[in-house]
Amino acid sequence: MKNVLKNLIAMAMTVVAGTTVIAQQKAAHLDMSAANGMITDKVSQLQFSVNSQLPVCNVNGLDGEALRFDGYSNYVEAALPVSSFSKSQLTISIVLAAETYPMMNVAEAEYAPTYATIFGNLDENTREGFAIELSSQGNLRLRFGSAYANGFLFTANGTKTLQCGRWNMVTAVLDKNSNKASLYLNGEEIGSCKMSRSDIRYNASKTFMIGKDETDLKSGCFLINTFCGLIDDIVVYNESLTSDKIAQMASNVNAAKPDFNYPASRYAESLWRPQFHGMPSGGWTNECHGMTYSDGKYHVFFQKNANGPYMARLHWGHISSENLYKWTEEPIAIAPGEAYDIKGCWSGCVFDDNNITNILYTAVDNGRAVIAHATPEDKGLVSWTKQGIAINGRPSGLSDDFRDPYFFSADGNKYVIVGTGKDGIGACTLHKYENGSWTNDGRIFFRGTNGNQHGTFWEMPNMTYMGNGKWLFTVTPLGMGSGVRTIYWIGKVNGDGTFTPDNDQPKTLEINGISKDGYGLLSPTIYQKDGKTILLGIVPDKLPSEVNSSMGWAHNYSLPREISIAENGELIQKPLESLKAMRTDVCVEKSQELFGEMSLSPVCGRQIELLGEFTVGSGEMGFHFFKSANGKATLSYNTNNGMLTLDFTTLARRSNDGGSYNGVYSTVLPDKPMPGEKLKMHVFIDCSIADIFINDKWAYSVRMFPTNIEQIETEVFATSPVEVSVKAWTLDAERSGSTSVKGIFTDAQDTQSQIFNLAGQQCPSIPQKGVFIKNGKKYVAN
């Protein structure tokens, strides 16, 4: 884009009566490439700080770098010298790409939009300055103060909305002589107003706002009148450019797709951000839904707020992966914009029907929810087209809640189930595809029997055929006495499409006792490929909003689990085999009698895999991880009472479970191993999440937030003599395809002279730049 702006200089030459007239010099030029957190005006050479809670991020612009705005915390206040700005003729040109629109005021209907200032120094009280603004509905407007009548505020409203997910050029031209102020989008005039042939007024003491309105409008601790996306260039000219010149300038703007993903540098000093678990590059996520496979990749769609790590005006995010552990965020798939989904695009499902991929989602306006439909424009599932409403609201006789559609087919019939409640008990409606449309007569697919045990409303229903006539039905109920957790039934689909469980009482998806009050894996998405049934779900971090604000993100997904049904009708869960490809050459393998503690050095850090097989005797056995001189996390099994416990009570951490677990997650194993039998513990640690598998049968995921940089050591232990076979690896999500291990350490190694990064991975030498750990202490290399 910088080259386009160079062309602007040349094009700003006009011919009047055969005489070449050189346009005035630029009044300001901000190329938005930040250095040391500062941007520079190329005209005045003044520098301005980028206000940001996290490290300032440059990303690729159209030409050179653009500044990334996160939609809730970062903006610029620039004291540009308005004494050099013309009062009679002005052109403002901005190259930008919006990921989303500014957040609406969640306390009001969306008919009252929020505006964010893209660039301007407008003083509404004194009617001085100007501002180009973007609304929460995508509308653009130009406002400016004029000398008319001792100060008058003019507005030029745009008639077209700014398109998200692409580069745009927004241009404003103010021309006193022609008595017109015009607003352009990508070279097309979309709005104008008269300006009473009056001078533009400026307030010399008023700073320019970039990416935020001058006021602070918040939802909780998050700013909402802020811009989310990229700004590449801002140029102010003391010249009124013609419409032809503006159109020519804008002709090259959409030459490339913007990449909104935050660079890794944003989280370089984070101890908590997972590396091989699915999640967006920033902002807020919740339920992942609609896992599918297309064009050589797995795709997971999810609830996303790009404008900050908090829940509001939901979009459908999209991540993809070739291996289910190294993830890339794709552009937003579905965004609010139609009358029926203006308040949010909530959860639903992705399914293939006649080799066509489809999305069904919950569309929410200011008063109700409907089920809407969308189809992809490409095999990569990047761009989607909305197809309108598929099911027009909830049938009568149900609770007000009606959301989260899920598609399945049985006996040649196509069905959709939708979460709801009936008579105070959770249920799902059943909709059958007949004569080109979905029925909506209030039929119930399945309903619980007790609101306290089964919830009063069911979120995120899922139906998966598991073979041998058996179906797996999962839901995440609200209103349960135990708080939010995911439960499941196994049963059959009847000829009319309804469901009959094998047992009236459901089971918990997570090992019993570990998941309650919204902890653990929730609302799974399930996909079948190559004979495997793969499950993953959201694992909320349960942190206060202020902590999420400082982190820049909220929540992530579990590791993929392979599930099946045992002969006794229970669900079996084990880690997906392909996760082995992350194993590095830093590893340990030992088989011996163990009594006491044994270091697993050099395997240490925050991205590790621990695999232990214990011959059950007496006492306790298990693993220590995140160990330092002052504490540790402990996973243990007590052979005397069959208790499996994950204990964080001595771990220095940011507590996220007070009042629910208080650092101790315990349960009695459903099948207690007897003396002489084997107990298998398989643990994956990724910074702030642990995925734990027991005997390739039970699983659970837990969040923890260690605060000490020295918490990196690992051990295996037993309080009485036991035979143990243990393997451990450091993991690296950048690895792919190879599961070979080149070196096996059979003896504990001294790590005091070794160097590690913040993820706990061993470095061959001191890095030239960044944070590293040596001898248990933190250093910064510049």
Regions of interest found by a model, annotated:
Residues 771-782:
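C-terminal tail/sorting-segment detector
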Residues 1-24:
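Bacterial Sec-dependent N-terminal signal peptides
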Residues 262, 494-519, 525-737:
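Beta-rich accessory regions
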Residues 24-51, 57-260, 265, 593-611, ...:
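Extracellular glycan-associated modules
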Residues 1, 463, 738-744, 760, ...:
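Terminal processing/anchoring signals of secreted or surface-associated proteins
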Residues 184-187, 693-696, 759, 775:
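Short strand-turn-strand beta-turns centered on an Asx-Gly dipeptide
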Residues 244-404, 408-453, 467-517, 537-589, ...:
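Beta-rich carbohydrate-recognition and catalytic domains
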Residues 258-260, 734-759:
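Residue-level detector of functionally pivotal "anchor" positions at catalytic/ligand-binding pockets or at interdomain
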